Amino acid sequence: MAEISRIQYEMEYTEGISQRMRVPEKLKVAPPNADLEQGFQEGVPNASVIMQVPERIVVAGNNEDVSFSRPADLDLIQSTPFKSLALKTPPRVLTLSERPLDFLDLERPPTTPQNEEIRAVGRVKRERSMSENAVRQNGQLVRNDSLYGISNIDTTTEGTSDDLTVVDAASLRRQIIKLNRRLQLLEEENKERAKREMVMYSITVAFWLLNSWLWFRR
């Protein structure tokens, strides 16, 4: 939406400029230190210039007049004949036996007798395989009915095995989460036990130090 609104704004902006912008007919030059409104009202002699847009701009040196000749580029463009390109109509049907896919290669190697023999052998193999496939398709139509029931059994067994694997993965994930929670609880209990042992150890040491100090004072 932002892109569409920006494009619409640009189109409206350019259209407004092209409609409202006009080239002035005259440019009036006011003398220095003069009031502009008074100058425009009274008019300054020989201070107005008629504004005209030139068709072309020609640069000439040493105050020499240059005849406005025809541009050489335009003559060159009109003199050069346009060459017509002959395009060959493509065939309606493309077959692999008549046209192999080797023409798609950008850099085609030079044709040699060995390459021609290899292509001929490949073409014969393709035709033979196509005929064998046609024969096999007729035989497979009879077997499809018997194989359909077996395939259904296989799909059901595969579906049940997939469901079992999903259930096993979910149960394993739950067990791993429970084990992680138990490990966290054990670590917290060990930390609290270490703190309690440190407090008890410090209390016992302070008690023995106090008793020894009292005994030495006696």
UniProtKB/Swiss-Prot annotation:
It comes from the Eukaryota. GO terms for cellular component: mitochondrial outer membrane; peroxisome; synaptic vesicle. Pfam families: Miff. Its main location: mitochondrion. InterPro entries: Mff-like_dom, Mff/Tango-11. The keyword Membrane applies. The keyword Transmembrane applies. The modification Phosphothreonine is found at T89. Residues 1-198 are cytoplasmic. GO terms for molecular function: protein homodimerization activity. The modification Phosphoserine is found at S129, S131, S146, S171. GO terms for biological process: mitochondrial fission; positive regulation of mitochondrial fission; protein targeting to mitochondrion. It is a single-pass type IV membrane protein. Residues 167-198 form a coiled coil. Residues 217-218 are mitochondrial intermembrane. The chain crosses the membrane at residues 199-216. Keywords: Coiled coil, Cytoplasmic vesicle, Membrane, Mitochondrion, Mitochondrion outer membrane, Peroxisome, Phosphoprotein, Synapse, Transmembrane, Transmembrane helix. It is found in: Mitochondrion outer membrane; Peroxisome; Cytoplasmic vesicle, Secretory vesicle, Synaptic vesicle. PANTHER family: MITOCHONDRIAL FISSION FACTOR, TRANSPORT AND GOLGI ORGANIZATION PROTEIN 11. Homodimer. Interacts with DNM1L. Interacts with C11orf65/MFI; the interaction inhibits MFF interaction with DNM1L. Plays a role in mitochondrial and peroxisomal fission. Promotes the recruitment and association of the fission mediator dynamin-related protein 1 (DNM1L) to the mitochondrial surface. May be involved in regulation of synaptic vesicle membrane dynamics by recruitment of DNM1L to clathrin-containing vesicles. Belongs to the Tango11 family. This is Mitochondrial fission factor.
